[in-house]
Amino acid sequence: MKDVLERFLGYIKVDTQSSEESDTVPTTKTQLEFAKKLGEELKAIGLKDVSVDESGYVMATLESNIDKKVPAIGFIAHMDTSPDLSGTNINPRIVEKYDGQDIVLNKEKNIVLKINEFPEILEYKGQDIVVTDGNTLLGADDKAGIAEIITAMEYLINHPEIKHGTIKVGFTPDEEVGKGADHFDVKKFGADLAYTLDGGGIGELECETFNAAKAKVIIEGRNVHPGSAKNKMTNAVLVANKFINTLPENEVPERTEGYEGFFHLLSVKSEVETAELNYIIRDFDRKKFEERKEQIKEVGKKINEEYNKEIVCVKVEDQYYNMKEKIDEVKYVVDIAYDAMKAIDIEPILVPIRGGTDGSRLSFMGLPTPNLFAGGHNFHGRFEFVPVLSMEKAAELVVKIAELYANR
């Protein structure tokens, strides 16, 4: 599985950031260009039925090499990188045989990956680790997943003695902006079940995601000359401040963990005349999720009552739901992944995803899709890193899962 590093380093050279602002599909042209390159690579290694549609979805098939019928399994990763930090001109560095000390990413800017801030890196002492130069994210989320899947497919093609059923490969655009499954054709894909490789550190096996919604809060103020503003001006900036401070201060990402939900204020655009707040709402428990949506609406309602006019408008839109309720219906998909990890000497770590994957939506579209580790850490930022061995083991895991299904 040594080719996985070379593939990964090649993929991250292509800037495939998605965009929250764009209405095109995919949201950026570079994703479509990257999709076409991946399509050509899949053809070159010998996959069949390779397609790249106008929306940027890549699909391909590795045909079964056994006579008996077993479930067709899919492996899925996303092509875009997060809009949270630049993915242009990524300049990776391989830290060989990591010595367990702080890693200076950028000496000139004094950007250091510190072990007291990111202690999980100590788990990889002695291993080769790919890091950034401190100016961009790395793109292991999720180009590591793509590299792992393609490397595994090539390995299976080159080792026909490993028996497997039909395998479907899928690469999606715009996962980072919540649109990865919008135009995914489950019927065309043709898998009975699937796995995304979009998780974090080695061993992660995830079948629970947040329930997710987004909220846009529009505040209409009224600007009047400050010299004569008494009882006339409505300062949207101050109303926005009131709205923000009315929500629970401890129910935010930086103060929650595990199964705890939160309100996350993504952005504020504000002046006296108008203000706009953009939130995401997350909770694992469906009942608490619904309560959170009502809670944020209630804040707007109370402010309107206080001002005795409709100055706050709160619009809430669901994004995806906790896939656990769908995965539980076909629990064996998790059991096989668990057994596959054990078989290749990986200790499975069953954890909830404090986020979402394409699998969240796909599971509710009829394709049960738990999530496997891709190996990276600290996604969406300059401190992102991925151990080389973790990528190699992820590729090995894909092969082992295919093998276990063939032997069921």
Curated annotation (Swiss-Prot):
Cofactor note as given: Binds 2 Zn(2+) ions per subunit.
Keywords, in A-Z order: Aminopeptidase, Cytoplasm, Hydrolase, Metal-binding, Metalloprotease, Protease, Zinc
Enzyme Commission number, as recorded: 3.4.11.4
UniProt entry tagged with the keyword Zinc: yes
Cofactor field: Zn(2+)
Positions that bind Zn(2+) 2: 141, 176, 380
Keyword Protease attached: yes
SUPFAM superfamilies, per the entry: Bacterial exopeptidase dimerisation domain, Zn-dependent exopeptidases
UniProt-listed InterPro entries: ArgE/DapE_CS (IPR001261), Bact_exopeptidase_dim_dom (IPR036264), Peptidase_M20 (IPR002933), Peptidase_M20_dimer (IPR011650), Peptidase_M20B (IPR010161)
Any GO molecular function: tripeptide aminopeptidase activity
Active-site residues, Swiss-Prot/TrEMBL: 80, 175
Annotated Gene Ontology cellular component terms: cytosol
GO aspect biological process, one term: proteolysis
Reaction catalysed by this enzyme: Release of the N-terminal residue from a tripeptide
Sequence similarity: Belongs to the peptidase M20B family.
Purpose of the protein: Cleaves the N-terminal amino acid of tripeptides.
The name this protein goes by in its record: Peptidase T
